[in-house]
Amino acid sequence: KLYADGTADKPIVFTANSTTPTSGYWGGIIINGKAPISGSNANKSDTGLTEIDNNYKYGGNVDNDNSGSLTYVKICYAGARSTADIEHNGLTLNGVGNGTKIENIYILESADDAVEFFGGTVNVTNLLAVNPDDDMFDFTQGYSGKLKNCYGVWESDYTSTEADLR
């Protein structure tokens, strides 16, 4: 479980240790839960999820899984690559349940997706994604939670986006 609970006046900031940070400077936040996912939670290699290490299991049958709380959190310049094929998101929620609290989140310039949901039932309220290099929000493995007041913005001078052929 991860508990990172800031306030509107004092948010918790996860960012690069640099005076000139860029997207992909560090890995990002990854939370593994026990909520339902589609497909096998024993072997995710058949889902094309090369960014997930099969040694770290997630998913199960606990809809209300509590994987902690993120409130008033800023995630900046995440999305580093582990290898040429393994890239990370600003926030990755793997089989996270609706007993987890995710509210008032700001994700700035992630080198991959701002946030990706791999199944799970977690609800997210008040999320702003700015200038990710890939998707604002990505969903796979049967995500079935709810998003409320979640927005994404690409600033007009930001040119590092990638397009998926879908």
How would you describe each model-predicted region?
Residues 1-166:
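Beta-strand/loop edge motif enriched in small/polar residues
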